[in-house]
Structure formats: structure tokens, C-alpha cells
Amino acid sequence: MENLIGYVAAFLTTVSFLPQVLRVVMTKQTRDISRNMYIMFFLGVVLWFVYGILRSDLPIILANVVTLFFVTIILYYKLTEGNQT
């Protein structure tokens, strides 16, 4: 049961990034997104991923791999967009 809760929580928190990723990819605009927040979030997700590996916790690992992918897309657009903040 606790694994099911972990998978559902991981799914919901990870999928919550999908609308933002889709908007950024479609509009190519990140002006209203905080660069520093996403950099700190990226680093936090990397640490969660490492923690999941160290604990062999599949829900944590899977959620953070997908979240890293989404956050990397947003950060890529943010960092390559120019001087917009």
C-alpha cells in the first residue's frame, strides 16, 4: 500500500509540470518564469534522484527522472531565451 501511495504521489507531482513544459515549448517564452527558482529546483531534483538511488526507491527515482527531463526543458528555454528575466 505504501508503494502505491508513493507511485500516485510521484505521478501527480511530476505530471503537474507538464502544462508548464507544453506552454514553454509552444510559445518559446519564459519571461515570467524565475531562472533562479528553476536552477534551485533542478539541483533539488538531482539530489532527490540521488537519494532515490541510494535508497533503491523506485517511485522516487522514476518521478525525479521525469521531473528532471521536464525541468531541463524549461531551463534550456529560459537560459537560451536571451536576457529576459
Curated annotation (Swiss-Prot):
Molecular functions per Gene Ontology: D-glucose transmembrane transporter activity; protein homodimerization activity
The keyword Transmembrane appears for this protein: yes
Residues annotated as transmembrane: 5-25, 33-53, 57-77
Membrane disposition: Multi-pass membrane protein
Record's subcellular location: Cell membrane
InterPro entries: PQ-loop_rpt, SemiSWEET
Keywords: Cell membrane, Membrane, Sugar transport, Transmembrane, Transmembrane helix, Transport
One Gene Ontology biological process: D-glucose transmembrane transport
Record Pfam families: PQ-loop (PF04193)
Every PQ-loop domain range: 2-59
Chief location bin: membrane
Cellular component, GO, one term: membrane
Role played: The homodimer mediates transmembrane sugar transport down a concentration gradient. Transport is probably effected by rocking-type movements, where a cargo-binding cavity opens first on one and then on the other side of the membrane.
Subunit structure: Homodimer.
Protein name: Sugar transporter SemiSWEET
